[in-house]
Amino acid sequence: MSTKTKPQKPNIIKPLLGSVREYKKPSVITPIFMAVEAFCECLIPWFAGRLITTIQANGDKLMQSIFMYGGILLALAICSLLSGVLAGRFAATASCGFAKNLRHDLFYKVQKFSFANVDKFSSSSLVTRLTTDVTNVQQSYQMCLRIAIRVPLQFLFAIIMSFLTNPKLAWIFVAIIPFLAGALILIMRVAMPFFRRIFKKYDALNNSVQENVGGIRVVKSFVREEYEKEKFDKAAREVRDDFTKAEKIIAFNNPIMTLAINVAAVLISVLSAYAIIDADFWAAFDGYKIGSFTTDGFGIGQLSTLISYGIQMLSCLMMFSMIFVMLSMSLESARRISEVLVTESDLASPENGVKEVKDGSICFKNVNFKYSAAANKYALSDIDLEIKSGETVGILGGTGSSKTTLIQLIPRLYDATDGEVLVGGENVKNYDLDTLRKEVAVVLQKNVLFSGTIKENLRWGDENATDEELERVCKLAQADEFIRSFPDGYDTYIEQGGTNVSGGQKQRLCIARALLRKPKILILDDSTSAVDTKTDALIRHAFAEEIPNTTKIIIAQRVSSVEHADKILILDGGKIIANGNHETLMKTSEIYRETYEAQTKGKTSQQSEGGEA
């Protein structure tokens, strides 16, 4: 009979502990000081009770005893204070350092992700994990170092000291523990599902904010402010509603704790009062006798001590419930962070990967590709293509024809599902990723500029580039003229996302940045769509003259952008349906011919009208 092994749950905490690193020392020292503080706190009621008993007895050495016990209490209070302060300092150092390392590790992990990994986590979700989730885990880590160490120790000390004071009455405190534990577990079992939903709705809330802020110009141009407000309010209400439901359940926690301890305190007070008044009160309970309980051995001092320990236990239980709630919330945050940390990049550099790309030749051999193994349909099918080094290749196709998908396989942003992609005669999987991507510069559809000067943005291509090199590539990209029109020229500050430059200017800056890398392969993914046809032609002419040995792949919607290419590909439904130069395709491809004629008809008509005038 075969036995099926249950899949093991992933360890949530272990991936996070690796971020403690250099903060192990303060993480170990903090609990030591907390243990000292807890021990001192538990000795104070004991000696306070002895002091009360001494005063009550009114013996010959009363003042001497008062000074002795008073001195001990003062020393314990100072020791407790210093231990608490030092524990707080070390805990703050450890938790803040841990959070810093955790954010560092998360951010670096995301930087290593492939496009497929990034597709798995939405950008809003990653932002939440790097901010809110890390903050939750940081607070819980600090709480664990301090309160989570102190509470069980102080509770244990208080129980022990209660039994040393009077075993019979101490059992009353012990008896309420199972009731309180059961109530706490029940409360958290009901509340936890709400916390899971809350974090998912936090992602939706952040996504709403990101979309709105990123597309604020579109929102305003379409007068959609009210719709966006309603969408945001809905997301905010959902977070509020789930938080409210969870808090309503957790609200039972403290009252239940307080009630139980107060009942115990009342019982102890009543029984102690009877015992103090009547020495024979416990005679009826001789069968259950655990320790001596007489007026000679028990008095107001011992009663005060027991009540103090009861208050300490109440405080410990309430703090424990608070820790339990906080840890339950942060456990979901820890799970989300751990999910990112344990996710391995789908694409990794091989050991001893090839460190040099010989040339800009590209070859696709029987390539098929789909974005996930579960997908029913291939995004690319039966791709066989050969591009010689230095060739210019144009790619045309309708929306959704997988033009961008095709070029993303070249710098290995994705791996082909079937077949091989070769660059410089070598399978892209054999290259060191950094080496390959330095030689394949891609200007994507979505042009991204970062906050900083134009020079700083351009030097993403080559951080050691001289000013002369910057000017050269900007002239090739037809960007030099408009840059010099700015008052600060190349030192002009670019706002986040490039919001203070036009779409065409942004595209040309991104092209210049790519050229600065001096790549063997340059890919422009519809990267001149926002420039006029004259500027587009100037860019293409500059490429032909200045970088003839660079393989150039141009994805475009305008036939004029690719008609002078050595080779033009027509994609439809993820397949290459036509391949040839302009003259060949005009004869053999009806789609190309119709597209060309449709795009040039208006221009021809205008020229004819101009000739007749």
Q: How would you describe each model-predicted region?
A:
Residues M1-E41, A48, I55-L73, A87-A91, ...:
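Membrane-integrated ABC transporters
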Residues S2-P7, C96, H104-T128, T132-V134, ...:
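Short intracellular "coupling" helices and adjacent cytoplasmic loop segments at the cytosolic face
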Residues R21-K25, K112-A116, T132-L145, I149, ...:
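An intracellular "coupling" helix at the cytosolic face of ABC transporter transmembrane type-1 domains
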Residues E22, P26-E37, R50, L82, ...:
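Transmembrane helices of ABC transporter permease
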Residues P26-S27, L76-S95, R146-L153, V174-K201, ...:
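Alpha-helical transmembrane segments of multi-pass membrane proteins
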Residues L62, G71, M161-A175, K245-R336, ...:
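Helix-loop-helix
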Residues K355-A613:
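ABC-type nucleotide-binding domain
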